[in-house]
Amino acid sequence: YFPKFFHPDPSVKRQSGFLKPEINNSNILGSSFTLPYFKTISHNKDLTITPTWFDSDTLMSSFEYRKVEKNSKLITDIGYVSGYKSSSTKKKKNISHLFLNYNLDLNLENYISSDLEFSLERVSNDTYLKVFDPHITKSILRPKNFDNLNNSFKIFLNHNDFNFESGFKSFENLQISKGSDRYQYILPYYNFDKNIDQDYFGGKINFNSNGNNDLSSTNDLKSSVVNNLTYNSLDYVSNFGLKNNFNFVFQNLNSI
């Protein structure tokens, strides 16, 4: 008996089942066989279990969990590799990764939208992502750069009168060996936009302010605040049919 395969997609009813298996070959890892299994937990929760067997006696297990609520969405991907032997050390070890993305609608009163976002990227080995590239998740959690990991906590507020974004970010450069120097922290940062006047002498006046504290290379701290006051004229058409406009920008820069 061989289990029936299901391929979940929006056009079919959600149901548990095996997904399409894969066979791969790598100069580093050798041949491998992957057999994903999709598990429906409830109407708003599901899990994809993805074991991969390598002919080098290495086993990789990945678990991607998804949960959607009325005002929130969570997706996590956890991977664990047992029995991996590095070509440099020739010793077997266990390595892992954790990726996470969480979105929450704060539903604040008097705001068009108010959202919170948290994302996390962690690995236990600097070359893990490159070595196991074909077996790393293809979802939105997949790191965009295998040399740099990004982590962030952000808040977005959209109001009729202004837009505001703030939070913190951290970056880890996997190519730098010194532990403290490989990290960069933006803590905090902000960006504020406000339309002051929509009809001022035939144009619009907008105010923008943004700033951050940037800590890198262990103790290199830089702080900056930039304020911009912008005037944008409305378009006007000349007698020759040419459309024209102009703008002025007044900028105040403060940095340490």
What are these regions (language model features)?
Residues 1-256:
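Outer-membrane beta-barrel proteins and related beta-barrel translocases across Gram-negative bacteria
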